[in-house]
Amino acid sequence: MIGTLCRFALLTLLAVAPATWAASPEQVPTVHGLSLYGEPGLPAGFTSFPYVNPNAPKGGSLTRAVPVSFNSTNPFIITGSAAAGIDYLGQSYLYDSLMVSDPAEIFSAYGLLASGIRLDPQRRWMEFDLDPRARFHDGEPVTAEDVVFTFNLLVEKGAPFFRGYYADVTSVRAEGPLTVHFDFAENNSPELPLILGQLPVLPAHYWKDRDFSRPTLEIPVGSGPYRIERLDPGRQIVYRRDPDYWARDLPVNRGRFNIDRLIFDTYLDDSVALEAFRAGNIDLRAEMTASNWATGYQGPAMERGLIGQLVVATHNPAPLQAFVPNLRRAQFQDPRVRRAIGLAYDFEWQNRNLFYSQYRRTRGMFDGSEMEATGLPEGEELALLEPLRDQLPPEVFEEPLPIEEPSDLRERLRQALALLEEAGYRVENDRMVDAQGRSLSFEILLWDGRMQRMVLPYVRNLRRIGIDARVRVVDPSQYQVRISQHDYDMIIGSFAQSSSPGNEQREFWTSDYADRPQSRNTAGIRNPAIDQLVESLIRADSRESLDAHARALDRALRWNFYLVPQYHNPGARIAYWRKLAFPLPFPDYGLDLDAWWVDSQRASRVEAAQDDQQP
């Protein structure tokens, strides 16, 4: 599940003894939470998530920067750019979802709008009982009809993502005012109950007479912990904590959503955003630039202990960032060409000279986890790959991972030249050309000019072996249009991986998504073997089996050289003004900023110091 897909981690399946019949709802126990494998970690009647401060004070404000402007409050469609704070899956500031995850657990979730959950032992259906106290912001109750309406609305009029995400749901219906019933297709994904738990519930009475397919700047009716206080289109959105929020005292919310006002300001230039932070106009920021982290926060405020820096590691797979060649282009069809262009990437030089040695090289799809393929395949992983032997590169079975590459760039470039020669290319007048004399060339498309600092050394290495590589920078809106139309040779892509990969892998890697507009299969991969491995992974029925399936997929993708993996930070880098406080230790599988609060005494000192530094 993409992590960032939202703050919702993976949920699902209550472990129950196997059965050969579909139980009726009356025969299935009603539970407070679900776990993908085994029992959920927190018992019925738990009082709060274990990582929060249940007595955290309320009050204060938090200002954050966002790098893109917005023109809509509807994040559920592909048109428009939605404002920060309204997620399309899971609980957000504006909308509650049926369930919410505990980032201290890897595969569990607990009821939010749902006060009770029933799951058929054979996973043919599930039901949610809604909390009778649940209310939208206008006072209307949240009903089963709202859930049915939301599901159908997202599938029929929402982004194409939803149709694939909920493809294994065959029907949904209300069983009374507060119970909703979902029927599942046969051989559905084990994580499907979790996926449904992520469903945000929209008010049918508000949306039924509005055009859901179009962007809007109306302030919608929600049910979540905050209301939109103010909108300045493209520039700022302000949320105000709702003191009458119906779920404020539920165990899943206790100690969370502590800050009264949440302000998201748009800064299209990150250097301006950094200066705004240093001036005290932004309270917290995630730092993405190594040089900023090393030197950008130095100054009187840091010396006086008013600014803090955190590196927060999680147990999730490392985020995957990579150069993504577009396989829809002819020059990238040969895997030997793809391997050759990967050999020209010199991570070690970049890390030393550009990144203050802060990063680690990313090796594969699930780097740093039990799902990362290493050595040679064996056991269940080998059994999964063996039927596909004729469709996979022989190295999958014969060569261990990680792939060995010389540390010396010159030797890597010699290997790249040899691979290109095998693929039918030759060097002619310092140009790499094919048998027809056509130059091997491609353009790397960027939306942020600052990325050239990292990309240009790679381009220079490619040119050393005769490849005509170029960089083009376009504005973010043009970039999005070209991405949606697959109009690029190569981009830098990101693939957020969770500790429980599932349905989202279809959109990353499978043939069915290769030509869909807006799909995340940006590489344009069409490979029946990969398709089969993804479908098999989605239906893995145990943690051990999921790990084996993920390793098989990882191995097959890596030996096809579909991507040129770049690097990752060992943890999230967070800079903050010390008016903010947070509970320790952090949860293992996510950083929950909504468990932070404003310390009023610290805030007074920080604000006085910020006033002193104003001109």
List the model feature ranges, each with a label.
Residues 111-115, 137, 142, 183-202, ...:
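Aromatic-rich, solvent-exposed beta-strand/loop patch
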Residues 171-173, 229-240, 265-329, 336-340, ...:
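Extracellular/periplasmic solute-recognition and catalytic clefts
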Residues 27-28, 66-68, 232-237, 241, ...:
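Detector for C-terminal structural segments
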Residues 129, 163-208, 223-232, 375-389:
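Surface-exposed binding/hinge segments that line
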Residues 89-105, 152, 196-256, 260-261, ...:
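Gly/Pro-rich hinge or "lid" segments in bacterial periplasmic/extracellular proteins
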Residues 52-57, 79-88, 116-160, 175, ...:
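Aromatic- and charge-enriched surface segment that lines or borders ligand/interaction sites
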Residues 24-122, 152, 219-221:
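N-terminal lobe/hinge region of extracytoplasmic solute-binding protein
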Residues 131, 214, 247-297, 339, ...:
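Ligand-site clamp/hinge motif
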